[in-house]
Amino acid sequence: MGEEHKPLLDASGVDPREEDKTATAILRRKKKDNMLLVDDAINDDNSVIAINSNTMDKLELFRGDTVLVKGKKRKDTVLIVLIDDELEDGACRINRVVRNNLRIRLGDLVTIHPCPDIKYATRISVLPIADTIEGITGNLFDVFLKPYFVEAYRPVRKGDHFVVRGGMRQVEFKVVDVEPEEYAVVAQDTIIHWEGEPINREDEENNMNEVGYDDIGGCRKQMAQIREMVELPLRHPQLFKAIGIKPPRGVLMYGPPGTGKTLMARAVANETGAFFFLINGPEVMSKMAGESESNLRKAFEEAEKNAPAIIFIDEIDSIAPKRDKTNGEVERRVVSQLLTLMDGMKARSNVVVIAATNRPNSIDPALRRFGRFDREVDIGIPDATGRLEVLRIHTKNMKLADDVDLEALAAETHGYVGADIASLCSEAAMQQIREKMDLIDLDEDEIDAEVLDSLGVTMDNFRFALGNSNPSALRETVVESVNVTWDDVGGLDEIKEELKETVEYPVLHPDQYTKFGLSPSKGVLFYGPPGTGKTLLAKAVATEVSANFISVKGPELLSMWYGESESNIRDIFDKARAAAPTVVFLDELDSIAKARGGSLGDAGGASDRVVNQLLTEMDGMNAKKNVFVIGATNRPDQIDPAILRPGRLDQLIYVPLPDENARLSILNAQLRKTPLEPGLELTAIAKATQGFSGADLLYIVQRAAKYAIKDSIEAHRQHEAEKEVKVEGEDVEMTDEGAKAEQEPEVDPVPYITKEHFAEAMKTAKRSVSDAELRRYEAYSQQMKASRGQFSNFNFNDAPLGTTATDNANSNNSAPSGAGAAFGSNAEEDDDLYS
């Protein structure tokens, strides 16, 4: 009676907060006593594994026992156990050669199993690796093999390598064959066969470099999903039988190119030991009637014969397009054949079909139902943690300098997929080689060992590579590698601060937004007179956040073809989401986002459709994706009001003409790398240029520099002419004094920009924004402030119950008269839209 019933937190009885843990449960290895951490060996014997006495007692082993040691990628070998009490519990020592045989590194885990019933070998076959016997004469058996096997008890495993030292040399051998079984101990009467063609190391290394789970980074959750659906049915089909369901038949992997879809399928095949049958989509197709379907049937038959098997169809969209959209009869027949083959697979035939594509929506929908491709796994662009994993994988065999910070690189490579990171590492290594090119003699056959030892990829090499690469998802969109910092933007301090809050905070402090349960604002509109630095501000924002920067020039998006303009906008936002965090900068926004309703004369209302598409894209920006839209215009009155509502471009920032201090700041920013005449006061220019925009000031600076360059070139020419006249006029004696005069450094006639140059430049300077235009901008800005400042005096205690927001608005709304018509638009008529 008193029994307390606890309500289930979920239909499955699992606390929903534990969901993430179960999603990757298959990746967690269960820690057992016989799993040992690998340390480096002290004595370099190829046949031993050393563990301490406690571990030996726990595993019920004795010194000298033969054990089976399992590593990665289904590799194992047989070794003899020795005691080393300097080791900690749960650790073991294995030498480098054995580690290579097991495909493991220091710090990895191996499992140990007793192997008491190992037999003696009747015959083993060994062959040397070619590059280790160069220059050796004499009998390999007498010098190397006989002492190695006669002097010690040696268990061997087919396929293993071992290194033998003899005299001053060491030779590497491979066990090619063992009789009667794969594992055996070499005894006194074992026949050792060693004659044959030496093995080429390149061929061996290709076999050793098979892809495994360790070679895949950045998609931990997806890896867990695929292993659940592929590895479990292949290795333990009884699990599904016991629970009474059919195992999955097919998995469809989709995602941008370069994320590792093909690599993942190969890794699963290598680690499970399944037969791997690769079908490259286009290779199946044939012009002969019936041959394409026949090729598919053969692939499935071959896989069923060699079960457990994985059939991997790469680029499946090329052989299974939507049947109602294709004109070719062959494609339709191939799709139908694939459907019947997948339906015809026996329930527990131990064959799994994996397909990969980067265009999942162009595949025939009949393939995407349960029983065919049951599961769809989105292998997306990795986040910073994923990128760090991928960087570690690609740099594990690279020689890195001490200053390389992989975490910083991972943080800076937004939008990079695995293939981009591989390319980045390769480019950084090439840059290191280029830097050492002076020390390398290309004509020599061999490169000096000192030069090879001095190679090491530095952080500067990675920075260089970063500057020369961009994410492959954005290759066709012009992604500008922007190098504009806040220092390049003079003045506008308040606006800079506001921008930092809008764009930097969500990227650098996402935890704060989570804490307050809000999603950050994603849109900003700069408006103001031409030349005030709106575009420059957007570039500086992208650099400071180290986000990708997509610059969209309004008129470029418009196309004469029906629907093409909207499609261009969709593509840009899709790419921005793929490479997030991204700043999408819409320059001259008024050209593509004009107020709707007035575009009847253009291409069937193309402008209206573009605005509609832009609105839906801004609303559809996924909350998890950091995509910021910055618009810039100098005609804010022409922009559709729906774009300016909160949730879209909700922060309207007026970029005014600079005041005197801002003008001085702009001049300093523009001239910070330019030599100026000592004592030249820029304040005089700043004071004189009332009403000038940043672009107007840049014109003055460029004009002054132009005059300085002109004077410098003319002075140089005059100096050269004088020298020639001097040489022709008198025969100069080459005395010591003459030689000294020759060597004297030439004095630069124009070393800096002078006051005269600026005075000359000021004569042609002019304002680009008239007073009348400026008044219109100021009035519009005041109108926007007034419309958004209705409740500036709001106080919780002051608002009595029963008063409506409208009452408060009416009492506070004091927009300046005429402000609504600032740009010639009639605000009174607009307000009466629904009357």
UniProtKB/Swiss-Prot annotation:
Result, substituting residue 315 to D: Severe loss of catalytic activity without affecting cooperativity between the 2 ATP-binding regions. Slight reduction in growth rate
SMART domains the UniProt entry points to: AAA, CDC48_2, CDC48_N
Keyword Ubl conjugation: yes
Alphabetized UniProt keyword annotations: ATP-binding, Cell cycle, Chaperone, Cytoplasm, Endoplasmic reticulum, Hydrolase, Isopeptide bond, Microsome, Nucleotide-binding, Phosphoprotein, Protein transport, Repeat, Transport, Ubl conjugation
Cited Pfam families: AAA, AAA_lid_3, CDC48_2, CDC48_N
Region described as Disordered: spans on this chain: 1-21, 720-746, 792-835
GO biological process: ATP metabolic process; autophagosome maturation; cytoplasm protein quality control by the ubiquitin-proteasome system; DNA replication termination; endoplasmic reticulum membrane fusion; endosome to plasma membrane protein transport; ERAD pathway; macroautophagy
Modified residues (Phosphothreonine): 735
List of residues that carry Phosphoserine: 472, 519, 770
Documented activity regulation: The first ATP-binding region has low ATPase activity. The second ATP-binding region is responsible for ATPase activity. ATP binding to the first ATP-binding region induces intrinsic activity of the second ATP-binding region. While ATP binding to the first ATP-binding region appears to prevent ATP hydrolysis by the second ATP-binding region, ADP-binding to first region promotes the coordinate and cooperative ATPase cycle of the second ATP-binding region.
Compartment(s) where it occurs, according to its Swiss-Prot or TrEMBL record: Microsome; Endoplasmic reticulum; Cytoplasm
Subunit record text: Component of the heterotrimeric CDC48-NPL4-UFD1 ATPase complex. The CDC48-NPL4-UFD1 ATPase complex interacts with the HRD1 ubiquitin ligase complex composed of the E3 ligase HRD1, its cofactors HRD3, USA1 and DER1, substrate recruiting factor YOS9 and CDC48-binding protein UBX2. Interaction between the complexes is mediated by interaction between CDC48-NPL4-UFD1 complex member CDC48 and HRD1 complex member UBX2. Forms a complex composed of CDC48, NPL4, UFD1, UFD2 and SHP1.
Protein name: Cell division control protein 48
Organism expressing this protein natively: Saccharomyces cerevisiae (strain ATCC 204508 / S288c)
Gene encoding the protein: CDC48
